[in-house]
Amino acid sequence: MIEIKGKYNSAKVFVDDYDKLEEACYKQILNLLNQKFSEGSQIRIMEDCHAGSGCVIGFTQTIVDKVVPDLVGVDIGCGMQVLKISKDFHFDLKNLDKVWRANIPMGMTHRITKHKFCENVNLDNLITPINKEKELLALGSLGGGNHFGELDIDDDGNYYLVIHSGSRHLGIEVCKYWQNKAIQYYQNHIKENSEIIEQLKKEGREKEIQSELDKLKFEKVPNELAYLEGEDLKGYLHDMEIAQNFAYWSRKAMQDEICKALNIKKKHILDEFCTVHNYVDIKNKIIRKGSISLYKDEIAIIPMNMADGSLIVKGKGNEDRNCSGPHGAGRLMSRSVAKESLKMEDFKKSMKDVYTTSVCVGTIDESPMAYKPMEQILETIGDTCEVLKIIKPIWNVKANDGE
């Protein structure tokens, strides 16, 4: 573990040494610690951390009285739905792939009709203005990027249907609306400062300008780190709860479609749980950006990559870690670097033991080689969770760039 200190706070980063922390990641962490909104909170960065868009991935922070919407970002409520299925059920992997593609929209596409689980999501209560009917048609669709459907198997022969997805376009709208609110809040303060300066100048009280500005306790912040507080913060958390619920039911809808199509019955189901890794834990007042909750005895999944599968773990409730853990292996290469440097031949070879029709140029940025090795994560997570099983993928599907 290393510690990084900034102007307003410090953060523990759960890597062995600075050599395992990329420079861009270090700079993002330091930038956050130099912002006023970080003051007084407990910030912990997970071992799978890497530089992200606007915020370091693997970030956790306890909420005091301020939140930056761009920290969680647009993929609100992104997580993984896991259904453990008895080894007595027979899977035909070729048919599973066919059934998935026939029933689950991927990439930019969405459903033609609304799924019945839309009744569990009340978009009418959103403060964020949206096209309700358009958003509801996205419930039950996978999306693109690193979102996937997967079938894994454990050492006992039992199966795990894993679905990784988020709140789709709804998350974009919610994040954009509230970050713009935060920027407007900041700009209003700038205007207020300017008016104070102008008034004091008119009155010949230039010497009092700095003392008056100091009373406001307001500092300049970049737009992407503008924060909400007070009633606006309450409004943001209200919308976050709805968007996170949307993401949950969207994954459940995809699971429902596959179970119906394959005739998976209750008697076949051994367990079911959900692990979210991009959200605000409203009950416990913790932000997790690329991090999962690991409260005591909580069962969770930590995916590694398309070839090596996932860890099934049980939380230890480590409060020094914000009761959190890594949400995956963490990227070793950015998407652009992966697309430029990785070869299709190596990608295909790494996936030889997994049935998939998704190994193509459009998904090469999700190649196993683009992620950190599993061993690096296993070395550091012992204080936050117990590894129960390592499950191996036998089928995987992802949207490619053209979908």
State what each model feature region is.
Residues 2-32, 38-45, 51-59, 65-69, ...:
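Domain-length cofactor-binding catalytic modules of enzymes
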Residues 47-48, 75:
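Acidic active-site catalytic centers that drive phospho-/nucleotidyl reactions
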Residues 69-125:
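A generic, well-ordered mixed alpha/beta core segment in the N-terminal half of proteins
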